[in-house]
């Protein structure tokens, strides 16, 4: 499966996908700088993929998004644009981008969320830059399909967790950051922890390995679709 290129190979989903599809070509920032168009061109020239699973992203918690909005917007936008552009230039047959449920409008009241709701409102203000960079990739993919009849798709997972997450209050996903906060409080013998949120937002959670399994099924069956990936259970945070 060397014709399959997986960016973000050392990330949360990438590490699980490697267990399921070990023969794909997994790359990380140590291999290629996806913010450099020349590095991206080099990557495609050397690997010559037929399928691209684009997992790479600049990710972090809410507070880091608030502190570094330009970084989250600009770097994700550049990375996604370069990888998608070179996928087309190198005649990649299938492209699958990974988005995030935070790109949906913040005021959605009905669950499960429908894919048609994507552009029906603004995302949460604290994740504005990251969310719009991811929205841009969805639009970019759809424009390629409309103009050139490509088979490019994206999936939108809910909040993910797993052993390969960053257990860091700044850069971790919600569950990973929460575990780190509780563990730190336990070590420091603190009697309570402070969580942000008033309990009204609803979130869905899924193990990252389940998303990796879905991606592997798409790859092995050569059937790709754009869709949400989530559970039916909602939790208030």
Pin down the residues of each PLM region.
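Active-site Tyr-X1-5-Lys
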Residues: 124-158, 177-188
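Adenosine-cofactor binding site in Rossmann-like domains, unifying the SAM/SAH pocket
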Residues: 22-42
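Conserved Rossmann-fold NAD(P)-dependent oxidoreductase catalytic core, especially the SDR/UDP-sugar
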Residues: 81-127, 153
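N-terminal Rossmann NAD(P)H-binding glycine-rich loop of SDR-like oxidoreductase domains
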Residues: 2-21
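NAD(P)H-binding glycine-rich loop region in Rossmannoid oxidoreductase-like domains
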Residues: 38-77
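Flexible, glycine-rich beta-alpha linker
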Residues: 33, 103-105, 129, 153-177, ...
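Alpha-helical substrate-binding/gating segment
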Residues: 160-163, 175-193, 203-228
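Conserved catalytic-site region of short-chain dehydrogenase/reductase
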Residues: 61-62, 97-112, 129-135, 147, ...
């Amino acid at each position: 499966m060397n014709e399959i290129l997986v960016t973000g190979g050392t990330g949360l989903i990438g590490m699980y996908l490697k267990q399921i599809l070990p023969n794909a070509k997994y790359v990380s920032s140590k291999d290629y700088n996806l913010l450099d168009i020349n590095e991206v061109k080099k990557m495609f020239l050397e690997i010559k993929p037929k399928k691209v699973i684009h997992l790479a992203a600049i990710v972090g918690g809410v507070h880091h998004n608030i502190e570094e909005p330009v970084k989250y917007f600009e770097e994700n936008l550049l990375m996604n644009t370069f990888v998608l552009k070179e996928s087309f230039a190198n005649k990649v047959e299938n492209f699958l981008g990974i988005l995030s449920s935070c790109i949906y409008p913040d005021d959605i009241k009905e669950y499960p969320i429908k894919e048609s709701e994507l552009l029906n409102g603004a995302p949460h203000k604290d994740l504005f830059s990251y969310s719009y960079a991811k929205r841009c990739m969805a639009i970019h993919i759809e424009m390629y399909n409309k103009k050139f009849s490509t088979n490019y798709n994206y999936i939108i997972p809910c909040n993910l967790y797993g052993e390969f997450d960053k257990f860091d209050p700044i850069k971790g996903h919600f569950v990973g950051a929460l575990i780190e906060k509780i563990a730190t409080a336990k070590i420091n013998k603190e009697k309570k922890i402070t969580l942000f949120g008033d309990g009204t937002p609803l979130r869905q959670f899924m193990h990252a390995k389940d998303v990796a399994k879905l991606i592997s099924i798409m790859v092995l069956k050569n059937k790709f679709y754009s869709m949400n990936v989530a559970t039916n259970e909602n939790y208030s945070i």
